Amino acid sequence: DPTKPALVNPKNIIEAILNQGVTSMFASPALLNRVGEYGKKNRIKLPSLKRVISAGAPVSPSIIEQFSSMLCGDAEIHTPYGATEAVPIISIASNEILSETRKLSEQGYGICIGRPINDLEVCIIKVSDDPIDKWSEDLRVPDGEIGEISVKGDLVTRNYFGRPESDALAKIKDQDSFWHRMGDLGWKDSKGRIWFCGRKSHRVATENRTLFTIPCEAIFNNHPGVYRSALVGIGPLHRQKPVICIELKRHKIKYSKKTLKNELVGLAQQHELTQDIETVLFHPSFPVDIRHNSKIFREKLAVWAEKKLS
């Protein structure tokens, strides 16, 4: 069923690759996880594969490591970043992820998505939900500071069809050109790499500070019983209550949810990044997009969480 890549039979995918001598593969993170988990467990190798591309949602280093165990020679997994309005704009390969950026991702620095593609300009600008009429260098934030990822180049779409309100929110005029605001948050490191920290609309603004989804979720995802997590905010912006929603790994829970909840709250308190998160909710199966089964619908989870807590 192409609408459920997370439930694919890994044997069928592996058999097709081996029988047809497949050299290139594109897979969503959910499918990559499903096939990689089976392949690593059964020590399967895919010698014909020269490159694997995974996109549609952030690809965790653990999924990359898992699938890489099946690859041979100099074959790598590439995780390009982009959107319908501009794709691809940034990319990175598995060797750099596993050797350099993985540890930082698991410590809550975000997911490293790599460096800009040639002939594209990518910059990080101040976070704002308002339209920006004209470009100014004052919009840029210093390296290391989280802001909105913005891009300028020939492959970026100029406007939306019949949607001037969307144009105003996404496009910034810059003399004869323009910048496109991706709606994603991230920061740039000293090597020019971009680190993805989640959607701008998904950030959780409490009375004290702003929390970003991908960095915070990484802390909870380190727990062996957690399949994936999602940070949501309950209440009005700048007065939101942060709630971490947890989807557990199937068939691997050996203790009660009460015990697990206490462990997760304790884990949050160990990290400055997550110390404000005191509410944990368990969800049986996160709502995800039909194409990739990887993009978590945090808006739906926020509605669910609010009902659970009311």
Placement of each model-derived feature along the sequence:
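Conserved AMP-binding/adenylation subdomain of ANL enzymes
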Residues: 1-23, 38
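Gly/Ser/Thr-rich phosphate-binding loop
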Residues: 22-27, 36-108, 121
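Adenylate-forming AMP-binding core of the ANL superfamily, especially NRPS adenylation
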Residues: 58, 80, 92-94, 99-162
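Conserved ATP-binding/catalytic segment of the ANL
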Residues: 131, 136-213
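C-terminal boundary motif of the adenylate-forming
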Residues: 134-136, 183-185, 222-249, 276-278
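AMP-dependent adenylate-forming
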Residues: 190-197, 202-203, 213, 228, ...
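Conserved C-terminal "lid"/linker of ANL adenylate-forming enzymes
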Residues: 230-235, 243-244, 265-310
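Short, conserved charged micro-motifs
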Residues: 251-260
